[in-house]
Amino acid sequence: MKLPLLAFFILLLSSGAGAQTVDALGTFTPYSLFGIGEIEKQGSAMNIGMGGIGVAVRNNRFINYLNPASITERDTLSFMMDVGMDIKNFYNKDNDVSSAYNAFNMRNIVITLPIYKKSALILGFVPISNIGYKFASPETDPLIVSKYGDIKYYKYGSGSVNKLFVGGALNIGKKLAVGVELIDYFGTLYKHSDVEFSSDNTIRTIVSGNDYTISAFSAKFGAQFFTPFANDKYLLTLGATYSIGRDLGGDITDYSYATDATGISVDTLYHNVNSNNTIKMPGELAVGFTIKRQNKWMVGMDYTYQAWKSTSFPPVRGVDFEATASHSLKVGVEYTPNMYDVRYYFKRVTYRAGGYYEKSYMKVNGKNLSAYGITLGCSLPISRLNNALNLAVDLGERGSLKDNMVRERYVQFIINVNIHDLWFIKPKYD
């Protein structure tokens, strides 16, 4: 029997309808039950403030790690570092059940260094996906209840997939930049399913789990073509990136054991470690463009495609789930009144806005899961001109109240600290 999707998305110690609140690390969403969890929006507050665009963004003040080719747009003596975090506030509704949760997550740690003339190095850490869910449902079959008593089914999960990367980029001529990243995917995904019996038997709970250890290497290639026009007043940039798809290697540990009323294990039903983890991170293609007036404004658009349909995931009891191709369209704009104004601080602030539409890789109960939203952001100069506090807010919605789905509305706050310093400058005076 198919169950309404996550109809019992509530705290384990609560029951009935009404609003529930949860605090968590990483994420806490029913949709992270599927696949490798909730795919994190990539990019710093600079990118998110503009709807998430970055494929064709070139900026000598901030790090754009969405395209490795972009890091050649920099002062040849500059050291740059970007550290970010985010806070998510999600509000879920499923028929008459409402829930809310807050989650905190490290967003990125990225460093870029000059190498030689118009070439540069980039290295960093970025979360790719997060799992966080916890919900319960009772047994409703009267024959089973009459024989075994009240039974509750619990599902809960946690974990993440992250990437470490190192890359380089260089300019070829005056209008083309190319870059490459070497990527190490790693992490562990924990997915548990428990059955709890209310009868006073030796066995009170059967605990089952699947632990997925992620370990894989991949690569990402990027290019940007940029050319001035209209008497060099404006700059047109075309960008593209491609990430190689890879099996996420590692081990799968399947286990099941029984516990008594005190939680002590009384019997191991099975325990198996399989080194053939076939979960796959598919290839990703992204293209985009920007039109920019230097130090004044920029508009742009990105499109991203990822072929998740070729990836198979373990089934989810009671819910039809399959992976499908994901698409996203993002648009954004930024504006700086006068970045060199010495009298009025807010004229030096960069203001951003954007929007996006995403069709997720999740297809649940025969329906594609989509999300859309608007974003706002700004860069607040700190001390020196290129040091800044970057802020962004993402207001969106995914899912719906139709077809036994969960409607999820969210507000995500992102903060990044950008450090920009000059190295190897010989002082004029000792």
Which residue ranges define each predicted feature?
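Sec-dependent N-terminal signal peptides
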Residues: 4-13
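Subset of outer-membrane beta-barrel
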Residues: 20-430
